[in-house]
């Protein structure tokens, strides 16, 4: 009876009255075992692939998401599932979200895509990674370009958005396409961290200019590997120009040594600083004041002015040495100097006459100065300057508080002051009479002044 029951057909509901085909129990068990083994084999293979990808993901770049060589193949479509794209060996794999995705499906499918399209942006990244390690990574390391709400992690996309704002959500290819040269330094640094430096030695693309350098350093400053390759030639032109301009200029030590030697030779030759400045104006057309020569010897001029004045002074020294120090040449150079008049010396008698006239009129008019100059046989300018100097001397000698009058103690004796300690006469009054008359005057004027 049991044997007969085994051959009863099984319907869809599992009852004995079903209309399904007859199946031997052993065949059914074998088919079920084969299906289970196939599912187990497929799951194990998928897990092995995941384990291999995870191992390569962490091992190749030492945990760095951009340490991997860039994937040259990216999945098509912008599905919202956000699953990782499958390689050619995973086209038959089970869907991560439940349904198998199609190659031409624009969205909705959460499974692996069946068709892969080569992205044009990968060509731009080919210059950065020319080694042979890209083939074993597969496209599974790159998330879907348009993935919006997937549950799978997307380290490449996140790293691209965090480190390089110019990169899109399209993974490393998006970074290379949208970020331009900015993705180069970060990738270069990650590749140097990898153990495949011999195979993945990148060379900067030719279109990387100053903008690329600045962009790379702004987002990946401190990346020594990138800086070692991107810095050469970045600013060599300016430094060469600066070095070329500094070749002709003397150093500060040379200027200091020349100023010291110039001062010693000038003093030995018997020239003053003013003579040197005027001689430069006479010989070369550049007139310099005594203050300028003094500041040059004291190293108080600016570096630029010191460099301009040094060749002129050096040439003047050569001209002076070539003259063999003859007195005629030295006097000629000194005579060609400033047009200053000699100092006038006034005789004692003439000076007394001027003093007496000054007491009468400290500030004479032009007509009076002319008459006085004619009478004393002096030049009109000499008389005018003498009166100016005499007035300045009077101002220095007279205190400002006294308003041009001597102190009270020098004019009046202590007994000649009034009872209150003040003067009996105003300060502008003429000198007082003798003591007896003053005493009598006090007796007669004080009562009247009190009344």
Swiss-Prot record:
Stretches with biased composition (Pro residues): 427-436
One of the record's GO cellular component terms: nucleus
Signals that turn on the gene: Transiently increased in rapidly dividing Schwann cells in response to sciatic nerve transection 2 days post-injury.
Tissue expression summary: Neural tissues and testis.
UniProt GO molecular function: DNA binding; DNA-binding transcription factor activity; DNA-binding transcription factor activity, RNA polymerase II-specific; DNA-binding transcription repressor activity, RNA polymerase II-specific; RNA polymerase II cis-regulatory region sequence-specific DNA binding; sequence-specific DNA binding; sequence-specific double-stranded DNA binding
GO BP term, pick one: myelination in peripheral nervous system
UniProt feature, compositional bias: Low complexity: 134-145, 220-232
Domain of life assignment: Eukaryota
Entry-linked CDD domains: homeodomain (cd00086)
Record-annotated DNA-binding residue ranges: 339-398
Region (Disordered): 1-21, 69-114, 134-154, 186-253, 395-451
Keyword Ubl conjugation listed: no
Pfam family name, one: Homeodomain
All residue ranges annotated as the POU-specific domain in the record: 247-321
Biased composition (Basic and acidic residues): 190-199
Localization of this protein: Nucleus
PROSITE patterns (UniProt xref): HOMEOBOX_1, HOMEOBOX_2, POU_1, POU_2, POU_3
UniProt keyword Aminoacyl-tRNA synthetase, yes or no: no
InterPro entries per record: HD, Homeobox_CS, Homeodomain-like_sf, Lambda_DNA-bd_dom_sf, POU, POU_dom, POU_domain_TF, TF_POU_3
Compositionally biased spans, kind Gly residues: 11-20, 76-85, 95-112
Cited PANTHER family: POU DOMAIN, POU DOMAIN, CLASS 3, TRANSCRIPTION FACTOR 1
Function (record text): Transcription factor that binds to the octamer motif (5'-ATTTGCAT-3'). Acts as a transcriptional activator when binding cooperatively with SOX4, SOX11, or SOX12 to gene promoters. Acts as a transcriptional repressor of myelin-specific genes.
Family, as annotated: Belongs to the POU transcription factor family. Class-3 subfamily.
Name of this chain's protein: POU domain, class 3, transcription factor 1
């Amino acid at each position: 009876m049991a044997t007969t029951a085994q051959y009863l057909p099984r319907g869809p509901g599992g009852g004995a009255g079903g209309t399904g085909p007859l199946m031997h129990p052993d065949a059914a068990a074998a088919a079920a075992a084969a299906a289970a083994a196939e599912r187990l084999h497929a799951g194990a293979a998928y897990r092995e692939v995941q384990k291999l990808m995870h191992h390569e993901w962490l091992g190749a770049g030492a945990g760095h998401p951009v340490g991997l060589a860039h994937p040259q193949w990216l999945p098509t479509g912008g599905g919202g599932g956000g699953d990782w794209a499958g390689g050619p060996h995973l086209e038959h794999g089970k869907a991560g979200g439940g349904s198998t995705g199609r190659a031409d499906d624009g969205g909705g499918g959460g499974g692996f895509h069946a068709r892969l399209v080569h992205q044009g942006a990968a060509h731009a990244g080919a210059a950065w990674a020319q080694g042979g390690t890209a083939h074993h990574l597969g496209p599974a390391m790159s998330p879907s370009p348009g993935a919006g709400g997937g549950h799978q992690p997307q380290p490449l996309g996140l790293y691209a958005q965090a480190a390089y704002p110019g990169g899109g959500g399209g993974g490393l290819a998006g970074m290379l396409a949208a970020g331009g040269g900015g993705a180069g330094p970060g990738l270069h640094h990650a590749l140097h961290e990898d153990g495949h430096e011999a195979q993945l030695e990148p060379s900067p693309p030719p279109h990387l200019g100053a903008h690329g350098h600045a962009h790379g350093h702004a987002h990946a400053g401190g990346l020594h590997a990138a800086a070692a390759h991107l810095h050469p030639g970045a600013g060599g032109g300016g430094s060469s120009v600066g070095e070329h301009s500094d070749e002709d200029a003397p150093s500060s030590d040379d200027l200091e040594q020349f100023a010291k030697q110039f001062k010693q030779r000038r003093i030995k030759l018997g020239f003053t600083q003013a003579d040197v400045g005027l001689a430069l104006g006479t010989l070369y057309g550049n007139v310099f004041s005594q203050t300028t020569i003094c500041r040059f010897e004291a190293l108080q001029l600016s570096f630029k002015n010191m460099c301009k004045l040094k060749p002129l002074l050096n040439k003047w020294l050569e001209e002076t040495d070539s003259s063999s120090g003859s007195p005629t040449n030295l006097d000629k150079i000194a005579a060609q100097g400033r047009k200053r008049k000699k100092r006038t010396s006034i005789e004692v008698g003439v000076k007394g006459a001027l003093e007496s006239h000054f007491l009468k009129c400290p500030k004479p008019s032009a007509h009076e100065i002319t008459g006085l100059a004619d009478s004393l046989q002096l030049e009109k300018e000499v008389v005018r300057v003498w009166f100016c100097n005499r007035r300045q001397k009077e101002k220095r000698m007279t205190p400002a508080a006294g308003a041009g009058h001597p102190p009270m103690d020098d004019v009046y004796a202590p007994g000649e002051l009034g009872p209150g300690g003040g003067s009996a006469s105003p300060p502008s009054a003429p000198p007082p009479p003798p003591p007896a008359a003053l005493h009598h005057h006090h007796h007669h004027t004080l009562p009247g002044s009190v009344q």
